[in-house]
Structure formats: structure tokens, C-alpha cells
Amino acid sequence: PAVALTGPRQVGKTTLAQEIGATRPSIYIDLESDAGRARLSEPELYLSQHEEKLVILDEVHRMPELFGNLRGLIDQGRRRGHRTGRFLLLGSASIDLMRQSSESLAGRISYLEMTPIDAQEVPSQDVNALWTRGGFPESLLAPSDQTSLRWRQDFIRTYLERDIPLLGPRIAAETLRRFWTMLAHQQGGLFNAAELARALGIDGKTVAAYLDLMVDLLLVRR
């Protein structure tokens, strides 16, 4: 009845979800906006009015109390024969979405991860651009290298100054920027926590916590 589509911000989750929604009756609710959250001030009442539609809930981890309501709605719908394709949940914070949904929606939800574009998805002549620009669509498809670089700089700044603080951790943006840069230099190599700790002037446990945060935000794979 529910599918969770996870992936970092700007990877294309919303675009894909809206394309899916265009193929059938659906509603889209952005829970990052005040207006979107206001629409679900009484979630069971509102969503029960759209039982015949696909409900797309974007940034669903921003409204964790919703998962309990979804469980009740899914169970009610099952009794009326609505067994598949009811809710599409989008999230860019892996740990919150997985924990909240697994606790409330066990047996009612499937998970899919959407990653940036990889080398198997681009023509051979575009592989060099993929290596230099990365696989985020806005960066890869930018009209110039300068525009692509500016997009990536803005993307990093948004994560450091807005998204990470929203999740709770109080980490100096410049410290996390340096950590992120050092991780990039270790791409494909052995992770050396002690070396990073010395370079940043922090202890190994803090390095591990920073890495866990990056993994939870789907920005680093290990």
C-alpha cells in the first residue's frame, strides 16, 4: 500500500513522483511547506477523502506523527480492497524515514532508493562530464561548467547551513565542509578516521558521528 522513495535532495525524487502521479488520479503534498502541513492538520479526515487516489507525500520525515495515521488508513483501505499503490512517500533523511516508517508501517511499506545518475545511464561521450560534474541532474545537465559548479556550491551550502541544522545536530558549517571535502579526497579508498580526526582537531568518535550523519542524509555511501 505504501512505497518510500529515498534519496538525497535534488536527485529527482519529486520529478519522478509527479510523472508517476500524472498517469493516474493523484494528489501531491509538500510537507516542507507550511501550506502542505496545514492541509494535513487533520490527516485521517483529509486523506480518507482521497482514498481512490495516489497520495504523494514529499519530505514526509518532516511530519513524523503522520506515520501512525497512515497505518490506520492503510488497514482501513485494505478491508475495502485497496491493497496497492495508495501512498508514495518521499524523503531525503534516510534514518528518520526508515525508523519512523518501519516502526509504524511494518508489513505495509516497501523501500526504493533513488541515486544520482551513474555511468550506465549516460551515453559514452558524456562520461567525462559525469566524472567532473557528478550525477545530480541539475549539475550534469547544466548549460556550462561554470553553471554546474555554481549549482554544486549552492547545493553544499544549503545542506550545511539549512538542512543539517533542521535535523538537530549543531555542527559548525565550516568544520563539516572540511570533513565533506576530505571524504571526497578519500573516494574509493580506505577510510582513515584517525587521520581525519587529527586534521580536524577532533576525536575519532566525533569523526564517526559526522560520517553517520552524512550516510543518514544519503550523501555518502559506505
Locations of the language-model features?
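Short glycine-rich substrate-engagement loop in P-loop NTPases that contacts/grips substrate
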Residues: S26-L54, P64
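P-loop (Walker A) phosphate-binding loop of NTP-binding proteins
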Residues: P8
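ATP-binding Walker
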Residues: V11
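Interdomain hinge/linker elements that couple catalytic modules in large macromolecular machines
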Residues: T115-R222
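Short regulatory helix/loop adjacent to the ATP-binding pocket of P-loop NTPases
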Residues: I95-S110, Q125-D126
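Walker A/P-loop
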Residues: T14
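Hydrophobic anchor at the beta1->P-loop junction of P-loop NTPases
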Residues: L5
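Structural recognition of the conserved hydrophobic beta-strand(s) that form the central parallel beta-sheet
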Residues: I56, R86-S92, E113
